[in-house]
Amino acid sequence: MVKIRLRRIGRKKLPIYQIVAADARARRDGRFLEVLGRYEPTRKPHQLTFNRERLMYWLSVGAQPTDTAKALIRRTGMLYENYMRIKGKSEEEIGTEMETWQQRNDSRLKRGLDRKAIRRKRKKEAEAKEKESAG
């Protein structure tokens, strides 16, 4: 069985992962069939690049992504696009669905960032109040 998974490269304390198609029996950093992309979690924001055509090919022939690889691929909408192709939708329908998915995803990410900013602001205010009352 072929798995789409992460292969760790990089140096100590600075991981970089290659997204690879590998036999399920191979070791984590062992033999693989093809490099499909790269994930750099230490960069801010995290950097994710991959070859869309080859990833779609491996998904179409039955390669199973691991949980972590699936989560990374899901962020880009590739799994949703593959699902629509399997269901037999036309390229036009897929294009419009992907546009609406992208808008929903962008708004979801923006809400998350706004929520973080509000939490930071409240924390600073609470610390300032605490300092005032203690001082």
Swiss-Prot record:
Q: Which organism is it from?
A: Chloroherpeton thalassium (strain ATCC 35110 / GB-78)
Record key words, sorted? Ribonucleoprotein, Ribosomal protein
Q: Where does the record place the region Disordered?
A: 94-135
**Member of which family?**
Belongs to the bacterial ribosomal protein bS16 family.
Q: Which GO terms describe its cellular component?
A: cytoplasm; small ribosomal subunit
Q: Which NCBIfam families match?
A: S16 (TIGR00002)
Gene Ontology BP annotations: translation
The protein's superkingdom reads Bacteria
* GO molecular function terms noted in the UniProt entry: structural constituent of ribosome
- Keyword Ribonucleoprotein listed? The answer is yes
Comp. bias intervals (Basic and acidic residues): 105-116, 124-135
* Keyword Repeat part of the UniProt annotation: no
HAMAP family cross-referenced by the UniProt entry? Ribosomal_bS16
Q: Which PANTHER family match?
A: 30S RIBOSOMAL PROTEIN S16 (PTHR12919), SMALL RIBOSOMAL SUBUNIT PROTEIN BS16M (PTHR12919:SF20)
What this protein is called in its record is: Small ribosomal subunit protein bS16
